[in-house]
């Protein structure tokens, strides 16, 4: 309701009471409007069903085909990766087995070499020990032989010094032998 307050002119926008109503609400044209709606919807249905729906259906089918193709490709890649993983695990197990076999073989070889070297060293040491024992025994025998002669000479000198007479050599030898053996022989 806009009114102009200008002098001399007045404009009204209201509809006077005898004029027709808004056409969609007019009861006289209601039946023709329903027929127009039915024709418009039928025409819209035909246009949509003949042109729009086939295009949308084609797009949907194309998209479904693309999705199925992508899923099949993804499954193929997954199967391929599963096969590669199994092959990797098989090769890894085989490599582990080979490594253990090589390690065992190396350990056995080194143990055999070590045993052979140890036995050779033991034989060498045994030979050296036997030689050393023989040398010691020979030296002891030689030393004991010298001890007997020295003891006999010393005993003879002592007895001669104390008694003033030369003792019997056989008697001194028996006394020295008895003394060296650890026994006492009264002479």
Swiss-Prot record:
<keyword id="KW-0813">Transport</keyword>
<keyword id="KW-0138">CF(0)</keyword>
<dbReference type="GO" id="GO:0046961">
    <property type="term" value="F:proton-transporting ATPase activity, rotational mechanism"/>
</dbReference>
<keyword id="KW-1133">Transmembrane helix</keyword>
<feature type="compositionally biased region" description="Polar residues">
    <location>
        <begin position="1"/>
        <end position="13"/>
    </location>
</feature>
<dbReference type="InterPro" id="IPR050059">
    <property type="entry name" value="ATP_synthase_B_chain"/>
</dbReference>
<keyword id="KW-0406">Ion transport</keyword>
<dbReference type="GO" id="GO:0045259">
    <property type="term" value="C:proton-transporting ATP synthase complex"/>
</dbReference>
<dbReference type="Pfam" id="PF00430">
    <property type="entry name" value="ATP-synt_B"/>
</dbReference>
<comment type="function">
    <text>F(1)F(0) ATP synthase produces ATP from ADP in the presence of a proton or sodium gradient. F-type ATPases consist of two structural domains, F(1) containing the extramembraneous catalytic core and F(0) containing the membrane proton channel, linked together by a central stalk and a peripheral stalk. During catalysis, ATP synthesis in the catalytic domain of F(1) is coupled via a rotary mechanism of the central stalk subunits to proton translocation.</text>
</comment>
<dbReference type="GO" id="GO:0046933">
    <property type="term" value="F:proton-transporting ATP synthase activity, rotational mechanism"/>
</dbReference>
<feature type="transmembrane region" description="Helical">
    <location>
        <begin position="31"/>
        <end position="53"/>
    </location>
</feature>
<keyword id="KW-0066">ATP synthesis</keyword>
<protein>
    <recommendedName>
        <fullName>ATP synthase subunit b 2</fullName>
    </recommendedName>
</protein>
<dbReference type="GO" id="GO:0005886">
    <property type="term" value="C:plasma membrane"/>
</dbReference>
<comment type="function">
    <text>Component of the F(0) channel, it forms part of the peripheral stalk, linking F(1) to F(0). The b'-subunit is a diverged and duplicated form of b found in plants and photosynthetic bacteria.</text>
</comment>
<keyword id="KW-0812">Transmembrane</keyword>
<comment type="subunit">
    <text>F-type ATPases have 2 components, F(1) - the catalytic core - and F(0) - the membrane proton channel. F(1) has five subunits: alpha(3), beta(3), gamma(1), delta(1), epsilon(1). F(0) has three main subunits: a(1), b(2) and c(10-14). The alpha and beta chains form an alternating ring which encloses part of the gamma chain. F(1) is attached to F(0) by a central stalk formed by the gamma and epsilon chains, while a peripheral stalk is formed by the delta and b chains.</text>
</comment>
<feature type="region of interest" description="Disordered">
    <location>
        <begin position="1"/>
        <end position="21"/>
    </location>
</feature>
<comment type="similarity">
    <text>Belongs to the ATPase B chain family.</text>
</comment>
<dbReference type="InterPro" id="IPR002146">
    <property type="entry name" value="ATP_synth_b/b'su_bac/chlpt"/>
</dbReference>
<keyword id="KW-1003">Cell membrane</keyword>
<keyword id="KW-0375">Hydrogen ion transport</keyword>
<keyword id="KW-0997">Cell inner membrane</keyword>
<keyword id="KW-0472">Membrane</keyword>
């Amino acid at each position: 309701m806009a009114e102009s307050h200008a002098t001399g002119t007045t404009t009204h926008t209201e509809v006077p009471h005898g004029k027709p109503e808004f056409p969609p609400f007019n009861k006289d044209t209601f039946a023709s409007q329903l027929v127009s709606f039915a024709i418009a919807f039928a025409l819209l249905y035909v246009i949509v069903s003949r042109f729009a729906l086939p295009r949308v259906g084609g797009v949907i089918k194309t998209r479904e085909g693309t999705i199925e193709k992508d899923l099949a490709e993804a499954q193929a890649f997954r199967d391929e990766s599963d096969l590669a993983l199994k092959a990797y695990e098989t090769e890894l197990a085989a490599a582990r087995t080979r490594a253990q076999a090589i390690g065992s073989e190396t350990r056995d070889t080194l143990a055999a070499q070590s045993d052979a070297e140890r036995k050779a060293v033991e034989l060498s040491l045994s030979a050296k020990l036997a030689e050393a024992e023989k040398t010691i025994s020979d030296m002891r025998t030689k030393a004991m032989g010298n001890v007997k002669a020295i003891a006999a000479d010393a005993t003879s000198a002592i007895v001669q010094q104390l008694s003033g007479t030369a003792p019997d050599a056989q008697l001194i030898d028996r006394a020295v032998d008895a003394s060296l053996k650890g026994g006492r022989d009264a002479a």
